[in-house]
Design a protein with these regions (language model features):
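A short acidic/basic microdomain associated with nuclease active sites
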Residues: 47-62
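Interdomain/boundary linker segments immediately adjacent to catalytic/signaling cores
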Residues: 1-40
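Conserved catalytic cores of phosphodiester-cleaving nucleases, focusing on short active-site segments
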Residues: 46, 67-90, 107
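Short, low-complexity, polybasic intrinsically disordered segments
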Residues: 133-154
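Catalytic cores of nucleic-acid endonucleases
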Residues: 83-136
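Residues at secondary-structure transition points
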Residues: 29, 33, 37, 64, ...
Length: 154
């Protein structure tokens, strides 16, 4: 019940836009705020979909990047990369396009470290991508791609 309520509240807030407009904020700060809000939205979205989130913003010393969300989808451990963008015009890159080969390799390294650190070597796992496109005044468009890529595919 709580995930449904929280998701409804976030849907309302998201319809007002993820990034706050401010004359004092740089584009980078606005993008960071939108990303944080997108990850919070994704957290509640996944909970509503039945995922059990066990880690947020996981980092390891010496490895570039972070795992946005780590969650169980049933018995499968899902490493979820969240990408939030303002709605793209036709022909423009989508949020999913931001996950290039280097990003996938970094995510795979982080995932292997997470699995080792938690002693989850016998647990099946995959990489999911949750893309969020926002337009002020409208509900976000959410696309969840299960098994979006593997560490062995480029």
């Amino acid at each position: 019940m709580l995930p449904q309520i929280m998701f409804s509240i976030l849907n309302f807030a998201a319809s007002r836009g993820f990034a706050e407009d401010s004359a004092d904020s740089s584009a980078k700060q606005l993008a960071r705020k939108a990303g944080v809000r997108g990850e919070t939205y994704a957290y509640w979205y996944l909970r509503r979909e039945g995922y059990i989130v066990i880690a947020r913003n996981f980092t390891m010393p010496g490895i570039k990047g972070e795992l946005d969300l780590v969650a169980y989808d049933g018995s499968i451990l899902a490493f979820v990369e969240v990408k939030t963008r303002a709605k793209a015009e036709p022909g423009q890159p989508t949020p999913e396009d931001a996950i290039n080969l280097e990003k996938r390799r970094n995510l795979a390294r982080m995932a292997r470290q997470f699995i080792r650190a938690r002693r989850l070597e016998n647990t099946p796992w995959r990489f999911d991508v949750l893309a969020i496109e926002t337009t002020a005044g409208q509900k976000p468009i959410v696309r969840l791609h299960k098994s979006a890529f593997s560490e062995h595919r480029s």
